[in-house]
Amino acid sequence: MFGSRIGKKFTYKAGLRGEMSRVTLDSRHDNISQTDYTFFLAPSLSGIYDIADGHELSLAVSRRIGRPTYPQLNPYMSMIDATTYEKGNMHLQPEKATKLDLGYSLSRGSFNLFLNGYVNHTSDYISQITAIDSQRLITTYVNAASDLKSGVDFTLRVNPVKWMNVSLAANTYYVSTSGEYEGAEISNKGVTNNSNVLFDFLPWKGGDIQCQYFVSTPQYFPQLTTSLTHQMNVGFKQRFLKGAMTASILLTDVFKTAKWEVSSHNNIFDLTNISRNKSRMLWFGFSYNFNSFKQKADQKTESDRSLIRLGL
């Protein structure tokens, strides 16, 4: 990794990472024994340009490799319900993605705006696919030809009055997946938007009331398309004893509108699934901080090299 500054406004970082992997597949049941070697080269480049005070442009280009997980590789079948089974695919290949991000941020006092446009192309995309076998639905995983996702992230935070903060976030993108496996079409495409708005009220000292609304338009997955869904959560938090003790309450899906509705119409089968999870829940929380230690301004912190960590 190398980084430098050009003039007073532009800084950049560039890097190159190479990775050699060896995968050994040994199955006595299927009489298979083979070893594959893969070399992956991952360059990266990022830069930040200070347009003016509070205005900033950023650019990032990167590559990554995503390897299949154990459930995706496990070739033995497991039952999900009376008619649906799942099995992995031990011949899955890693997926390789290239991503380009272009961002803009504006910060002026209580007003903060962030925009990010992105394009992400993935080859050998690891995709879930469902087929019919003897009146059973068999779900497995395959490598689709490609997956393309491009869109815009938008985040806005404002503080109109001292006792209220408002945050608005939205992610709008176009996705297109293409591929075919043993006669089954796994292609799908469409435009999706995921948005949420948060109102944070501070009515009195130590009190915090939050109201958040989520909206998701239809999502497009290989073989599957979901319907629009939305829900609202409301929460309250109160701090006591100079912040050492906190009591909180949260009610999710206030109007009980969250649902999971999926449809699939392909050359193998037609499927419509409508289900509703236990999305409306009432949570109570209580916490107390016994250690209110505050580090002095001139006290040195431990470096990563001198700090011994236990666990993750």
Residue ranges and their predicted role:
Residues L45, K189-L312:
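Conserved C-terminal beta-signal and adjacent last beta-strands/turns
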Residues N89, Q93, K99, R108, ...:
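Outer membrane beta-barrel strand-and-loop segments of large Gram-negative receptors
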